[in-house]
Amino acid sequence: MAAATPSDSSDTIELATTHQHNPHDHDDHKAEPDVDRAYLASKGFPKFFRSVLFQIILFGCISFVGPSIFDAISNLGGGGLSTPYLANLATTLNYVSGSLVTLFGGPLINKIGIKWSSFIASLAFPLVGSGYYLSARYGVDWYLLVVTTINGLTAGFLYVSSTTAMQTYPDQRDRGWYLGMWSAMMNSGAVVGGIINFVINYRRSGAGGVAWFTYLIFLGLECTGFIWALLLSPTARVRRKDGTRPDLSGRNVTWKGELEALWAHARQKTSWLVFVPAFYSFFYGGTMGTYLTLHFSVRARALSTMITPMCTIPMVMVYGKLLDMQRWSQRTRAWMALCSWVLPQAASFVWLGVEYHKLGTSTSTGLDPVLDSRRWAEAYLPFLIMFTTGYWTQLSLYWILGTFASDVKSTARSTGLFRAFTTCGMAVSYGLNSDASLDPRVPLSVNAALIALVLPCMITLIRLVPEKIDIQSEERLEKTSA
């Protein structure tokens, strides 16, 4: 084998040493970070344009018109179609192709850059709306399957680039708040989508599919994605409020070096510990979508797309602030974060099992909030708990991984692996729920069993979380405040 170049070897060594995650690693003093004095002296929009806050807002806008619209369609149950099976198959293809890209997402994002990776993803946003429109109105099902596969390939770029930015752009002390803001903006798109769904479909009290015109409005929103992506600043030009830059060490690594570094990340203990939690974190999407489609009316499903994100937005903002509270150590906050979603989700699985026993597996139930509000609320509440606390699951995993983050390049690799695990779970979930002959209680049972496997992984992972944030970061903040 040829000898590694200096940049390759140093990058690989960094991965092998920095990420062993000794709880006291972050207590070691590091070199004083480079502060951009010109940025601190600047004022007005030019300063704001390069700020972390503006980058988070832009990522929120991209998510608003991209993944958020996809969620609004998915939250209808079965993509808003009359049965869930075609939409679940399309979503399966979306996440299978996405998992292939995210697996190598770290090297790809490191070579292309966060900004242009996001731009590539935004170009495929309109394909989703057009696919559902043609399927709902003209029955062109093959097109839906093709475009969701293409969208999955490009969405993989956004999954890795946005998550990498969320973990490395903000200062450690503000990361939870920015994660909450980003998640809230994603759900704001789902709120808009939910309002559109409900206004168009609120008169439809029976089972079936939503009005095809719904998808045209979504398509129009998706067409704006590339604008927000082009406004992003390159990572090297992003500045935190104290004038520091995101750590860009390990630059100019060759493709061979990137793949070697990715392999080093894949062998780390934290990568394997996060596999099951990441696989589980989005698994509920297919399971809950099928539950909603089988047992609720079109009006109830449209209402759900509005209720779920409206509840989620304040929840993720509060959750983000909780993750940033300095009165507790990072590890204590990680324990609190775990309990906040594990307990309600475990209870919801039991509740959903009882509801399936009452409702059976037919598609003729059509529970409706107007015709029978009490029975609708009783069956809908566990669904709502699963979806809203599901965002807490994802935020807590992002935040925990952020405590291990060192530089943008290495974080992109670990994030790529994390999102590959996540999309793999989503693909399996929607794949199980795309089989019309399979009892829908089987995917629910698989989902419930996964939470039992999540617990030991999360317990071990949290024990590796550093007790304190970097001391230099603490001293730097004090100097800036002074």
Residue ranges of each PLM-predicted region?
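Intracellular juxtamembrane helix-capping segments at the cytosolic ends
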Residues: A72-L76, G131-Y132, A155-D171, N197, ...
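Symmetry-related core transmembrane helices of the 12-TM Major Facilitator Superfamily/SLC fold
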Residues: M181-S183, A211-L232, C339-S348, P443-R463
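Intrinsically disordered, low-complexity terminal tails of fungal membrane proteins
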Residues: M1-P46, V238-W255, P466-A482
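A membrane-interface helix-boundary motif in multi-pass transporters
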Residues: K115-W116, N201-G220, Q330-A337, G431-L453
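Structural signature of the two symmetry-related core transmembrane helices
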Residues: Y85, W116-Y132, R333-L352
